């Protein structure tokens, strides 16, 4: 009969495999017995991190805590993480949002802050004092005079494209580039340009067609909202 609980050494270290065919009660009982049988094992005397593989199922926080407690109380092992082959509804929703292009046709006025979890396409202008925050890339088909923050949660591979005018500011992750100097004050129109973080960790402003070379994956974007 196949065991519901197995401890194996893998290339990533020690893993505990819990069958997704067994009930949580069966797993708890079998895990407790297995660890009790291994009391005199080579793991004792030193804490070892283990991964818990739970297959095609998800554990609640309470179930994870119960498994963690059994391992903590009956061995010298500590859980580094639980790994599942499936995704929760919340995680799936977040993944879908990150992989999606959000779009609006409007003017972002002073005091307005638009924040999206994925890429963002704006058909319209961003006025001084207006702000866009996107976890992904930002594309503006209009004049940018406000603040554009791409890669808001730290993605330095994000890019910004649009017409950058005084006194706009571009932020990518934690990098900042300002168009607030006197050189930009007299510019009333410009072509579309792109902004991205280069190999020296600085924001560079370049011609729009350079995006395809710098970030070739952008040409594969699909979808919208």
Curated annotation (Swiss-Prot):
- GO terms classed as biological process: cell morphogenesis; division septum assembly; regulation of cell septum assembly
Source taxon at top rank: Bacteria
What does the sequence similarity comment in the record state about its family?
Answer: Belongs to the MinC family.
| PANTHER family the UniProt entry points to | SEPTUM SITE-DETERMINING PROTEIN MINC
The intrachain disulfides are none
A Pfam family that this protein carries is MinC_N_1
Q: How does it assemble?
A: Interacts with MinD and FtsZ.
Transmembrane regions: none
- Described purpose of this protein according to its UniProt entry: Cell division inhibitor that blocks the formation of polar Z ring septums. Rapidly oscillates between the poles of the cell to destabilize FtsZ filaments that have formed before they mature into polar Z rings. Prevents FtsZ polymerization.
| Record InterPro entries | CAP/MinC_C (IPR016098), MinC (IPR013033), MinC_C_sf (IPR036145), MinC_N_1 (IPR055219), Septum_form_inhib_MinC_C (IPR005526)
The species this protein belongs to is Listeria welshimeri serovar 6b (strain ATCC 35897 / DSM 20650 / CCUG 15529 / CIP 8149 / NCTC 11857 / SLCC 5334 / V8)
Question: SUPFAM superfamilies this protein is in?
Answer: Cell-division inhibitor MinC, C-terminal domain
Keyword terms of this UniProt record: Cell cycle, Cell division, Septation
Q: What is this protein called?
A: Probable septum site-determining protein MinC
């Amino acid at each position: 009969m196949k065991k519901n609980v197995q401890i194996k050494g893998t290339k990533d270290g020690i893993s505990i495999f819990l069958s997704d065919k067994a009930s949580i009660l069966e797993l708890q009982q079998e895990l407790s017995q297995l660890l009790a049988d291994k009391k005199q094992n080579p793991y004792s005397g030193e804490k070892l991190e283990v991964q818990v593989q739970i297959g095609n199922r998800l554990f609640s926080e309470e179930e994870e805590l119960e498994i963690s407690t059994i391992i903590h109380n009956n061995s010298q092992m500590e859980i580094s993480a639980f790994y599942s082959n499936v995704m929760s509804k919340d995680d799936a929703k977040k993944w879908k949002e990150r992989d999606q292009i959000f779009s609006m046709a409007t003017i972002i006025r002073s005091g307005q802050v638009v924040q999206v979890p994925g890429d963002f396409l704006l058909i319209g202008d961003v006025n001084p004092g207006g702000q866009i925050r996107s976890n992904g890339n930002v594309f503006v088909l209009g004049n940018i005079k406000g603040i554009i923050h791409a890669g808001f949660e730290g993605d330095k591979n994000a890019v910004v494209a649009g017409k950058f005018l005084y006194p706009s500011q571009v932020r990518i992750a934690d990098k900042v580039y300002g168009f607030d100097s006197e050189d930009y004050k007299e510019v009333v129109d410009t072509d579309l340009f792109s902004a991205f973080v280069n190999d020296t960790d600085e924001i560079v402003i370049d011609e729009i067609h350079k995006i395809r070379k710098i970030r070739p994956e952008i040409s594969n974007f699909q979808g919208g909202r």
